[in-house]
Curated annotation (Swiss-Prot):
Catalytic activity: N-terminal N-formyl-L-methionyl-[peptide] + H2O = N-terminal L-methionyl-[peptide] + formate
EC number(s) from the headed UniProt entry: 3.5.1.88
Active site (record annotation): 149
Protein name: Peptide deformylase
One GO molecular-function entry: metal ion binding
Similarity section: Belongs to the polypeptide deformylase family.
Cofactor(s) named in the record: Fe(2+)
Gene of this entry: def
Disulfide pattern: none
InterPro entries in UniProt: Peptide_deformylase, Peptide_deformylase_sf
Key words of the record: Hydrolase, Iron, Metal-binding, Protein biosynthesis
Co-factor: note: Binds 1 Fe(2+) ion.
A Gene Ontology BP annotation from the UniProt entry: translation
Source taxonomy: Bacteria, Bacillati, Actinomycetota, Actinomycetes, Mycobacteriales
Organism: Mycolicibacterium gilvum (strain PYR-GCK)
Length: 197
């Protein structure tokens, strides 16, 4: 369908919990959801992302797509969509995240990355594009992606969970880029790739 602009930190749609996708009595999903899912895949692929939530393209609906390896530097990837995800995780460490192992970025915070504490394991239950119940789980990078994308749908960015010097560095970065205000976007495939892919 179409590559859409990606909202940048500060847009209210990124800081608001999304609305669940309605499910019909027969388990059917709205007909227009297929177009949204296609746009999410097209946009994620053009941006070279490992995941993309609907509110990142300005749509306040509880759905995300992913194309993510189980671990960093692995070539085998899992690709899919989760409608109305519910997240379950192991305990999140209370220690300061490791700058190398816990580095995390976001298409809505283009070109920046910060060490972010995440649970080592995560599971998401929800529906696939046809309304069939699914469960996906993983560790390492895949678990990080599940937590990151579900966080988006709950109205949070990974910046919200940063601590200490990482939180201060992120705040400075947002200010230096002029972000933190409504209406800012970037266009994958047209604007320079902020992560240099």
């Amino acid at each position: 369908m179409a590559v859409r602009p990606i909202c940048i930190v500060g847009d209210p749609v990124l800081h608001t919990a999304t609305e669940p996708i309605p499910v019909g009595p027969d388990g059917s999903l709205p007909a227009d959801l297929a177009d949204l899912i296609t746009d999410l895949y097209d946009t994620m692929d053009a941006a070279h992302g490992v995941g993309l939530a609907a509110n990142q393209i300005g749509v306040n609906k509880r759905v995300f797509v992913y194309d993510c390896a189980d671990a960093r530097k692995k070539t085998v990837r899992r690709r899919g969509v989760v409608v109305n995800p519910v997240l379950e995780t192991s305990e999140v460490p209370e220690t300061m995240p490791d700058p190398e192992d816990d580095d995390e970025g976001c298409l809505s915070v283009p070109g920046e990355s910060f060490p972010t504490g995440r649970a080592d394991w995560a599971r998401v239950t929800g529906l696939d594009a046809d309304g069939t119940p699914i469960t996906i789980e993983g560790t390492d990078l895949f678990a990080r992606m599940l937590q990151h994308e579900t966080g988006h749908l709950d109205g949070f960015l990974y910046l919200d969970s940063l601590i200490g010097r990482n939180a201060r560095a992120a705040k400075r970065a947002v200010k230096s880029h002029g972000w933190g205000v409504p209406g800012l976007t970037w266009m994958p495939g047209e604007d320079p790739d902020p992560f240099g892919h």
